Amino acid sequence: MEEYRAYLELHRSRHQDTLYPLFFREYIYGLACGHGSILVESVGYNNKFSLLIVKRLITRMYQQTHFIIFANDSNKNPFRGYNNHFYSQIILEGFVVVVEIRFSLQLFISSLRELEIIKSYNNLRSIHSIFPFFEDKLIYLNLESDIRIPYPIHLEILVQILRYWIKDVSFFHLLRLFFSYYYNRNNLFTPKKWISTFFSKSNPSFFLFLYNLYVQEYESIFIFLRNKSSQLRLKYFRVFFERIFFYEKIEHLVEVSVKDCSYTFSFFKDTFIHYVRYQGKSILVSKNTPLFINKWKYYFIYLWQCHFDIWSRPGTIHINQLSRHSFHFLGYFLSIRLNFSVVRSQMLQNSFLIKIVMKKLDTIVPIISLIRSLAKAKFCNVFGHPISKPVWANLSDFDIIDRFLRICRNFYHYYNGSAKKKSLYQIRYILRLSCIKTLARKHKSTARTFLKRLGSEKLLEEFFTEEEDIFSLIFPIPKTSFTVQRLYRGRIWYLDILFRNDFVNHL
């Protein structure tokens, strides 16, 4: 229990208002907080979620020999104001929290046994530290393979995977009950609809758990195969549950076990191969010949077909030359750029021209995809022309400007790793004009008239502030310093970014 309290303390800043009860051990309740995510919207249940209602429901479950709430012919509601689907949602959310505890606490339990909590907390790293890893390693590699994790997987296989580390028979009965209930209710688990159900808005935690369970199983086998081909020491980064809370840098030999947890980012490092997984996609990069990486390609295909009964065509895994193709990763387009330079060398009376080729990781901002994301959020149209934000017109002027400024700063903060920042100027232009049009809409005037009336007021001064000035606020160096200008033109990877940009999630 002390370990669990420590977990709550570390995540208190990310807590939600929803309380999840654990009802598998008599009447002892544990409350799990900190399950907030930028990927998953919180479910409010129409503000009717009550711990008292849950307690009454648990008591009723202990007294009954069957689940009345799952009966198809039962439309009666034993409690006022709540329907049967509400009961199923409560039980399902509690069920997911129970099975996720083993995953979410594994890192902290292992840290508490060997280290202090504070020391473990200080080892947290930013998402942006992944890109310096790429800068150091990708320039020496030549092949990249994009792997799309295939769906669907049979539900009974998921149950068999869980049997390795859960021995409670009633647990599997309850799991099959959920499968049967949601299959009959919405027919969710048909192959055509399986992909969308993994991140269903109605039950995101449940489907995220199933997805990570499946990926954890195949990656543990992949680690085993990789260790058979190399005995070198491994370094890898890890993140919980596709939710991008944080990740911790670990340096140790990986122990392959079916009990290993599923992580979003995993780097298996040796001289020849690197592996990265994020969302539903994996990247495999290598310095070896195409025959070698093609061998790994068929390893994955046979693994999915023989172990998980998933049919995956070879065309779903693409092998590309890094020097000729770019790939998408966490909101960036990454590619290897060749810089050519000519050096003149003279030896005695003879002179030579030496052509030098240097490789450099090129990080490009996907401006078209970002404009598409801004269009979905109603900041502009599909052509990139700014429009007003009507839903914010009822806010105060300060709140409207503050929201636009926060979005603009987040863009610059997240994409400062790109050496070509001209694309960000277009994003700033869209947000600035959208802010002006929203303010003009609120005051019932045109954008031109509103700007003229604004006159000498400095309401939008921060939007017109040069990026060098903002950068100088971050680094206390004189504005005229050549160091500031040089740093600004180069890449800046911030080590305080624990979440992806909200607009990156739509790319």
Curated annotation (Swiss-Prot):
Compartment list: Plastid, Chloroplast
Q: Which GO terms describe its molecular function?
A: RNA binding
Q: Which keywords annotate this record? A: Chloroplast, mRNA processing, Plastid, RNA-binding, tRNA processing
Q: What is its main location?
A: plastid
According to its UniProt entry, one GO biological process term is: mRNA processing
List the GO cellular component terms.
Answer: chloroplast
Family affiliation = Belongs to the intron maturase 2 family. MatK subfamily.
Outline what the protein does: Usually encoded in the trnK tRNA gene intron. Probably assists in splicing its own and other chloroplast group II introns.
Q: Which HAMAP family match?
A: MatK (MF_01390)
> Any idea what this protein is called?
Maturase K
